[in-house]
């Protein structure tokens, strides 16, 4: 039947692959395909352009593009798998076409190698601690992965303690493993988080925003009260201020930051600074 | 404080011309969608089609019981709760249809040995319930950030005793219809993912074509709704 076919063709036309460059900063939906820069010329308008064959068969100059979170390779195109804004980072130096990724808002954490996270010790079995990091599996932490830990000198870690560490093994096939030392054997701020303070959960997007360089929120919060703060990439934040009231105020501000514009934030900070 | 994105859209799908007889009631009802309204689940959405409303929550990728884990992909579970009474056989069969649709679309191989649970609660049922459940499930999965290879939507249509096709039927239209067909279509090429049919009918092609045309509007609504959500951040 002619009618449904024309309707179908019209709907399919909207889903042709677009060049990644043109979609930067826009919201992309799962299922969209993006063309990498070197393929745009090949596709061309209409796609059936005749090209004279070059006798000097040079290998097509492939630019190495890194596919970040939210994107998958699908043939020689990028398939969007999460909804969010498409971002691109130019390569700092050397070759490569940079990194493309989708900035999405999520609450659930999936362990990634190298991420610094806050975990809660849930079990102690032999030489391994089981640490809940908010993912699908508890991570394992060996007692030797603390600074200055030896078989005789065991670290003082109890069930229920908060641990700040980083992942050394985190992929979809294996149980995640974390450590509290860096590659040189130094703690570098990691380890058991001290007494008191408050642990609360926020979305992953907010953490990334707060950890971005030159984040105004952190600078303003630092001017309010003296505080200790630890950010985990798994959406957990630990704060400690002099009094419980100050700690709670800080926790509320950080949780609310996500939905406030910078003007509203400045108002609240100035009101708090006065009182 | 919760971020709520309430998007209203009045969508009309007029399939006026064509060789098949189309009645005046060939338009989709008023749509509305709200995301991230529940604080506990990783993703949640409420989808409204006319007076039919379904609330969906997604948990995942989360821990899975050893008896239910699959070694190379995520275990997808769908729980559908009716508005009143205990879930029965009809709910079980709908859960299975929704689960099969979601499994075709969700990239489960990225999260092996985990579980992704979709919980659907019927808030009000005024026709096209399965289609509304599918739409709510899709929006909730997107809200939770579960990796998917495409979006999907559900479109229901009812065939009258004189062959008139009505899209998005109300409960009254469903009761009086000769056949009720529900299709789940994917967003990339409008391919058929799932179909659930009840009654006497002879021409699936016509209904499928009408559903594919209507799904265009649903996907456009999804896009607008998600763009509005991300424009606020």
From Swiss-Prot, chain A:
Q: Where are the transmembrane segments?
A: none
| Gene3D superfamilies noted in UniProt | 2.40.50.100, K Homology domain, type 1, Nucleic acid-binding proteins
Residues modified to N-acetylalanine: 2
What's the main place this protein lives?
cytoplasm
Assigned GO CC terms: cytoplasm; cytoplasmic exosome (RNase complex); cytosol; euchromatin; exosome (RNase complex); nuclear exosome (RNase complex); nucleolar exosome (RNase complex); nucleolus
Q: Which Gene Ontology terms describe the biological processes this protein takes part in? A: CUT catabolic process; DNA deamination; exonucleolytic trimming to generate mature 3'-end of 5.8S rRNA from tricistronic rRNA transcript (SSU-rRNA, 5.8S rRNA, LSU-rRNA); isotype switching; mRNA catabolic process; nuclear polyadenylation-dependent rRNA catabolic process; nuclear-transcribed mRNA catabolic process; poly(A)-dependent snoRNA 3'-end processing
Location of the Glycyl lysine isopeptide (Lys-Gly) (interchain with G-Cter in SUMO2) covalent cross-link? 151
Looking up InterPro entries in the UniProt record yields:
Exosome_RNA_bind1/RRP40/RRP4, KH_dom_type_1, KH_dom_type_1_sf, NA-bd_OB-fold, RRP40_KH-I, RRP40_N, Rrp40_S1
Q: What is its subcellular localisation?
A: Cytoplasm; Nucleus, Nucleolus; Nucleus
The entry lists its GO molecular-function terms as: 3'-5'-RNA exonuclease activity; RNA binding
Name the keywords, alphabetized. Answer: Acetylation, Cytoplasm, Disease variant, Exosome, Isopeptide bond, Neurodegeneration, Nucleus, RNA-binding, rRNA processing, Ubl conjugation
Domain of life of the organism in this record? Answer: Eukaryota
Q: Which disease is it linked to?
A: Pontocerebellar hypoplasia 1B: A severe autosomal recessive neurologic disorder characterized by a combination of cerebellar and spinal motor neuron degeneration beginning at birth. There is diffuse muscle weakness, progressive microcephaly, global developmental delay, and brainstem involvement.
The family classification in the record reads: Belongs to the RRP40 family.
Q: What does this protein do?
A: Non-catalytic component of the RNA exosome complex which has 3'->5' exoribonuclease activity and participates in a multitude of cellular RNA processing and degradation events. In the nucleus, the RNA exosome complex is involved in proper maturation of stable RNA species such as rRNA, snRNA and snoRNA, in the elimination of RNA processing by-products and non-coding 'pervasive' transcripts, such as antisense RNA species and promoter-upstream transcripts (PROMPTs), and of mRNAs with processing defects, thereby limiting or excluding their export to the cytoplasm.
Quaternary assembly: Component of the RNA exosome core complex (Exo-9), composed of EXOSC1, EXOSC2, EXOSC3, EXOSC4, EXOSC5, EXOSC6, EXOSC7, EXOSC8 and EXOSC9; within the complex interacts with EXOSC5 and EXOSC9. The catalytically inactive RNA exosome core complex (Exo-9) associates with the catalytic subunit EXOSC10/RRP6. Exo-9 may associate with DIS3 to form the nucleolar exosome complex, or DIS3L to form the cytoplasmic exosome complex. Exo-9 is formed by a hexameric base ring consisting of the heterodimers EXOSC4-EXOSC9, EXOSC5-EXOSC8 and EXOSC6-EXOSC7, and a cap ring consisting of EXOSC1, EXOSC2 and EXOSC3.
| Protein's name in the database | Exosome complex component RRP40
Specify the species.
Answer: Homo sapiens (Human)
């Amino acid at each position: 039947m002619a009618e449904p076919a024309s309707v179908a063709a019209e709907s399919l036309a909207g889903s042709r692959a677009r060049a990644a460059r043109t979609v930067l900063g826009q919201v992309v939906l799962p299922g969209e395909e993006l063309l990498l820069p070197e393929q745009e010329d090949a596709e061309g308008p209409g796609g059936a352009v005749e090209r004279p064959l070059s006798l000097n068969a040079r290998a097509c100059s492939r630019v190495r593009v890194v596919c970040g979170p939210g994107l998958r390779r699908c043939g020689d195109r990028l398939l969007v798998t999460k909804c969010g804004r498409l971002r691109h980072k130019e390569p700092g130096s050397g070759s490569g076409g940079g990194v493309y990724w989708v900035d999405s808002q999520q609450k659930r954490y999936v362990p990634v190698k190298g991420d610094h996270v806050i975990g809660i010790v849930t079990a102690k079995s032999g030489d391994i601690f089981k640490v809940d990091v908010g993912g699908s599996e508890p991570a394992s932490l060996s007692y030797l992965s603390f600074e200055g830990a030896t078989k005789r000198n065991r670290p003082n870690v109890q069930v229920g303690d908060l641990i700040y560490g980083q992942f050394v093994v985190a992929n979809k096939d294996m149980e995640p493993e974390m450590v509290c030392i860096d590659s040189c054997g130094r703690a570098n701020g990691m380890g058991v988080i001290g007494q008191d303070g408050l642990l609360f959960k926020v979305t992953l997007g907010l953490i990334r925003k707060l950890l971005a360089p030159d984040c105004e929120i952190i600078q303003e919060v630092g001017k309010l009260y003296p505080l200790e703060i630890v950010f985990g990439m798994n959406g957990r934040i630990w704060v400690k201020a002099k009094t419980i009231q100050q700690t709670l105020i800080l926790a509320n501000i950080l949780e609310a930051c996500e939905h406030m514009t910078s003007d509203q934030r400045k108002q609240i900070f100035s009101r708090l600074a006065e009182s | 404080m919760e971020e709520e994105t309430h998007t209203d859209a009045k969508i009309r799908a007029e399939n006026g011309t064509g060789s098949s007889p189309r009645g005046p009631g060939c338009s989709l009802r008023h749509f509305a969608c709200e995301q991230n309204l529940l604080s506990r689940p990783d993703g949640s959405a409420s989808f409204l089609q006319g007076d039919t409303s379904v609330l969906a929550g997604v948990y995942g990728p989360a821990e899975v019981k050893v008896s239910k884990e699959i070694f190379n992909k995520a275990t997808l579970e769908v729980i559908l709760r009716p508005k009143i009474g205990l879930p029965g056989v009809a709910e079980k069969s709908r859960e299975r249809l929704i689960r099969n649709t979601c499994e075709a679309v969700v990239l489960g191989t990225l999260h092996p040995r985990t579980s992704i649970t979709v919980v659907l609660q019927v808030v009000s049922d005024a026709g096209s319930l399965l289609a509304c459940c599918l739409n709510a499930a899709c929006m909730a999965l997107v809200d939770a950030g579960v990796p998917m290879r495409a979006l999907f939507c559900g479109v229901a249509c009812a065939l009258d005793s004189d062959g008139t096709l009505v899209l998005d039927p109300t409960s009254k239209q469903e009761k009086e219809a000769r056949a009720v067909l529900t299709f789940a279509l994917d967003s990339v090429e409008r391919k058929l993912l799932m179909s659930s049919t009840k009654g006497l009918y002879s021409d699936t092609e016509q209904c499928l074509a009408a559903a594919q045309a209507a799904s265009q509007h649903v996907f456009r609504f999804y896009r607008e709704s998600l763009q509005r959500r991300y424009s606020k951040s």
